[in-house]
Amino acid sequence: MSKPDLDAFLHGDDAALRETNRRLESMPAEDRVRWALEHLPPQHVLSSSFGTQSAVMLHLVSRQMPEIPVILVDTGYLFPETYRLVDALTDRFGLNLKVYRPALSPAWQEAGLGRLWEQGADGIERYNRLNKIDPMERALRDLDAGTWFAGLRRQQANSRAELPVLRRQDGRIKFHPIIDWHRPRRARYLRRHDLPDHPLRDQGYVSIGDVHTTVPLLPGMLEEETRFFGIKRECGLHR
């Protein structure tokens, strides 16, 4: 595959973007990552929630670029099991972890604004802006991100069903090397490479965010209904 016209990608050449995505669709995830690291603009960064099966993307990308900055947005409300998994995977892979937090601590937010996640759709929207979107935008600016690797998958939600491998977002490139993977395929990858899953996976959690806005998957539920009380699936990071 020839080197893409990066300027065309960033400035609206949709035909070039579609053709590149057509070729990327036929490539294995490992080859997609290799191609992206060779051809897409720096700085390269990888975001991770350290949720279920998160070790897949961390292993897949960091084994080819060990020094890649790994962005974790710590809302202050993550599960204790998530914090322990962050420590374990950072030590195991030698991750270049970059932790970003909200400008206001959880206690300060609750003192002034109350429990935003209990205030309906508008409250959740504001909660996500303060605790997830603003810290991530700060991280991308600080790290001068040109290409953002993320572990989104089409299976996760209807809002992601049509996402391509490669797209533009806010003047940078967003790259989804496992966009077409299903959960069993990720589970096989974990077993093949002897990688740990999130401890809460065994308790029925399939998508893990903050303690107060995440529930296990129950019979009859869709995966996207396990977050934000079913009011929202997307927090706004991956629009």
Curated annotation (Swiss-Prot):
Asked if GTP-binding is a keyword of the record, the answer is: no
Q: What is its main location?
A: cytoplasm
UniProt superkingdom: Bacteria
Q: Catalytic activity, per the record?
A: [thioredoxin]-disulfide + sulfite + adenosine 3',5'-bisphosphate + 2 H(+) = [thioredoxin]-dithiol + 3'-phosphoadenylyl sulfate
Q: Please name the CDD domains in this protein's record.
A: PAPS_reductase (cd23945)
Any one Gene Ontology molecular-function term assigned to this protein's record: phosphoadenylyl-sulfate reductase (thioredoxin) activity
User: Where are the catalytic residues?
Assistant: C235 (nucleophile)
**UniProtKB keywords:** Cytoplasm, Oxidoreductase
- Please name the top-level EC class of this enzyme: oxidoreductase
Where, subcellularly, is it found? Cytoplasm
Return the Pfam families for the record.
PAPS_reduct (PF01507)
Q: Name one GO cellular component term.
A: cytoplasm
**GO biological process terms, semicolon-separated:** hydrogen sulfide biosynthetic process; sulfate assimilation, phosphoadenylyl sulfate reduction by phosphoadenylyl-sulfate reductase (thioredoxin)
**Pathway(s):** Sulfur metabolism; hydrogen sulfide biosynthesis; sulfite from sulfate: step 3/3
Keyword Transport set for record: no
Role this protein plays: Catalyzes the formation of sulfite from phosphoadenosine 5'-phosphosulfate (PAPS) using thioredoxin as an electron donor.
**Which PANTHER family did the record assign?**
PHOSPHOADENOSINE PHOSPHOSULFATE REDUCTASE
What family, per the record? Belongs to the PAPS reductase family. CysH subfamily.
Question: Know the name of this protein?
Answer: Phosphoadenosine 5'-phosphosulfate reductase
Q: Which organism is it from?
A: Thiocapsa roseopersicina
